[in-house]
Amino acid sequence: MSIIEDARKALLKYPLCDHCLGRLFASRGLMISNEERGRSIKNVLFMESLNSSTGTYNEDTLVALAKSGHRESLLFLRRMGKVIEQQPCFICGNLFDKININDIVSKVEEEINRQGIEFNSFQVGSTVNKGVIENEVKVSTELGITSSESIKRELNRLIGKVLADKLGKRYSRLNPDVVIKVNTSDGSVSVEVMPIYIEARYRKLIRGIPQVGDSSVASVAREVVSELRPLNVVLHFAGIEGPEVRVLGLGRPMIIEATRPLRRSLPGGIITRHGVQLLNLKAAGKVQVREIKSKAGELRRVFRILVKLHGSVTDEQLRSLEDYFSNRQIRQSMGKGRRVKLIYGLKVVPVHGSILELIVNTQGGFSVRRFITGEGTEPSVSGTLGIKVTPIEIDILNIWH
């Protein structure tokens, strides 16, 4: 069935405003608003209902058009001696005539200025009466029309266009800085500030700095993003290390989540405070939070470990240690389970007497300290050499995919 016949069928059953009629055929023709589409369809139906050569007209269609607010149909029927009262739109109850978009925009501006929010992009979310949604679905379903769009989507688009022009900001469906919520029942508005996700890496230049807690990596990160005036800050790390471990090289990946920030300009450069460096700060998204947690174990790490041997070993044993731990699987007890990780390579560098430096290239997600001592780990450095081996210093030289 054609658009015109579908529209005639709809109007004969329900009075519909231009917006709601046009929205039934939203996917049938681009570059035209729903209101313009609905108005054009009514005009075509009006012209088809009149036969100037015979002087006849289709009264049923004209009455349906008049009830739906078509001005020309109302005037024509009145001239024919038939007074038809316009009826409220069955779907929206003439919501588009009642809503004042300019008033809504003014309220949004006032709310943004009141809160002092800095933003570059926005999204609009509207709420409408439940009955409107039900009537919309009822009409589309009964008539078998599959080309429609929701009234909320049209409202969001109309309000969004005016807001974009008025505020000079960009509309974003995927990653907005703020979400503007409009209640069409009472015209109230609210502004929800979305979190900022900041991808970064951190280095720990000195020992004794924990990842979280007081005087930690987390406290430095919170101090840095306090300039954004957030309500709260949540840190997401790609793995953990103890306070005694330095993190060097490229640093450990992290995501800084600043909730409800009033400022959104990210600090740049390398930031050094209290023995912690934050670097490579850039905007991220929620998907990166999931990735940093799920893929932490896939990150490769290079450790520098200074160890003490509690017993004698030969040069041959040390050389064989390097060969043995080349692409070797390590099994490590973790609570009630066991993890299997890969050691890609191990290099032994004698330092002095019983002190050795080990450079370990490994898959992430296991305890390198226990790999040295042998606690819950098979095979281990201590177990392979057959003597007690204890770590003195641990540095993370690099972390990468």
Curated annotation (Swiss-Prot):
Q: Which InterPro entries does the record associate with it?
A: Pus10, Pus10-like, Pus10-like_C, Pus10_THUMP_arc, THUMP_dom
Query: Which EC numbers does the record give?
Result: 5.4.99.25
Domain of life per record: Archaea
The main enzyme category here is isomerase
Q: Which UniProt keywords apply?
A: Isomerase, RNA-binding, tRNA processing
Ranges where the THUMP domain occurs = 64-195
Q: Can you state which reaction this protein catalyses?
A: uridine(54) in tRNA = pseudouridine(54) in tRNA; uridine(55) in tRNA = pseudouridine(55) in tRNA
Q: Biological process GO terms, please?
A: tRNA pseudouridine synthesis
Q: Cross-referenced Pfam families, in alphabetical order?
A: Pus10_C, Pus10_THUMP_arc
List the molecular function annotations (GO) for this entry. Answer: tRNA binding; tRNA pseudouridine(55) synthase activity
Into which family does the record put it?
Answer: Belongs to the pseudouridine synthase Pus10 family.
State the HAMAP family in the record. Answer: Pus10_arch
Q: What does this protein do?
A: Responsible for synthesis of pseudouridine from uracil-54 and uracil-55 in the psi GC loop of transfer RNAs.
The record's section on NCBIfam families has: pseudo_Pus10arc (TIGR01213)
Q: What is this protein called?
A: tRNA pseudouridine synthase Pus10
Gene field: pus10
